């Protein structure tokens, strides 16, 4: 019995003349995600991509699991391929759904007939197939409001399809269709979530991280690399830039007022990030900041940080509570890694009493008391690049 995976488009189905480019991007992302599971043929029609396995014994459960994490997909399911003939549809429905229906107590039938030339209308398909299933599985009863199993028949242009499970997709837009951005990836909970959220809007992310040995450990860097690797499940391949930051932090400590340590550090991080971002054709920076969460994330502090940037700074977590961010972190499997007790450079030389409402002129005066430009250039030149590929 021939089986395929049906992938239903999300909001990209509403796109206009450029809808085709979104579809092509989604198919490209799907192909890369399942390339080591076997050979597949991918076709698209009527806001659906059909994943047709060309090899025998392909693990379609693994296909569904991987594809379900790809942005741009509203729903997906495994489905049995039938001829556009009701006798074939009903016979294969009984056989294909035997295990599911044998364990259920209630069911209903839904029919979607996009091919209006098909002889039977949707209500007729539901009634006829429902009767056959009741005859074959007499323990079942019909429940149209809250069934355990919903048997769906889709009659399309080339074939009919039968399935009983509709899995919610990741939603959003295909990664890559909205351009590139650079994620400031720390070892905390928020920044991986921010990267995931912007990837959901179709942005292909790169990541940048700052290390300050001996104040930060190799294990802290490994933790961030693990987070980056986890994000590839959703974001695809990620270019990871590791910036040496020790000299800059020591210069801040030795030459700037303590109350401005954190805000000046953030401004210099942004300066380095945007220089690398511009070289890599990234259109924006991404951070995990949330208003009022810590001293460096007040409105005044963020305004001072943004003043150092020439490109937009995207903050998808800006209006979220910590509990909301943690909920997403658990969902995408970054939370347990994020809470490992290895501190990053943001905790180095933390002031006892940071300025929570800094004035830009005061911050700029404090920063300009020392010429950081040679250290910035050196940090950019010594930045190391590592590529994290999706290779599950």
Annotated model-derived regions:
Residues 183, 207-209, 242, 287, ...:
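Structural beta-sheet core signal
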């Amino acid at each position: 019995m021939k089986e395929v995976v049906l992938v239903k488009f999300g909001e990209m189905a509403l796109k206009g003349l450029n809808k085709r480019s979104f579809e092509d991007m989604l198919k490209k992302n799907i192909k890369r995600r399942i390339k080591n599971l076997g050979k597949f043929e991918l076709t698209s029609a009527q806001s659906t991509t059909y994943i047709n396995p060309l090899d025998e014994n392909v693990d379609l459960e693994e296909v569904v699991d991987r594809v379900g994490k790809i942005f741009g997909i509203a729903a997906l399911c495994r489905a049995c391929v039938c001829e556009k003939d009701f006798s074939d549809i009903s016979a294969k429905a009984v056989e294909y759904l035997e295990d599911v229906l044998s364990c259920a107590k209630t069911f209903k039938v839904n029919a979607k007939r996009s091919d209006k030339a098909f002889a039977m209308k949707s209500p007729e398909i539901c009634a006829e197939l429902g009767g056959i299933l009741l005859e074959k599985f007499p323990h079942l009863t019909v429940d149209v409001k809250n069934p355990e199993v919903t048997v769906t028949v889709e009659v399309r242009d080339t074939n009919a399809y039968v399935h009983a499970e509709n899995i919610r997709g990741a939603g959003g837009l295909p990664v890559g269709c909205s351009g590139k951005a650079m994620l400031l990836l720390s070892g905390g909970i928020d920044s991986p979530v921010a990267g995931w959220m912007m990837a959901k809007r179709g942005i292909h992310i790169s990541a940048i991280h700052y290390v300050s040995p001996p104040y930060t450990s190799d294990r802290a860097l490994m933790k961030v690399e693990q987070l980056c690797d986890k994000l590839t499940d959703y974001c695809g391949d990620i270019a990871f830039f590791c910036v040496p930051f020790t000299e800059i932090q020591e210069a801040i400590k030795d030459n700037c007022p303590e109350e401005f340590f954190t805000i000046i550090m953030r401004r210099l991080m942004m300066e380095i990030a945007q220089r690398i971002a511009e070289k890599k054709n990234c259109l924006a920076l991404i951070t995990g900041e949330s208003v009022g969460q810590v001293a460096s994330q007040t409105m005044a502090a963020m305004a001072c940080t943004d003043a150092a940037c020439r490109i937009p700074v995207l903050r998808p977590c800006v209006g979220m509570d910590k509990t909301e961010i943690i909920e997403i972190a658990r969902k995408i499997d970054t939370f347990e890694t994020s809470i490992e007790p290895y501190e990053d450079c943001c905790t180095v030389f933390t002031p006892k009493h940071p300025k929570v409402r800094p004035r830009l002129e005061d911050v700029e005066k404090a920063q300009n008391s020392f010429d950081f430009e040679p250290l910035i250039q050196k940090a950019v030149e010594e930045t190391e690049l590592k590529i994290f590929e999706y290779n599950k």
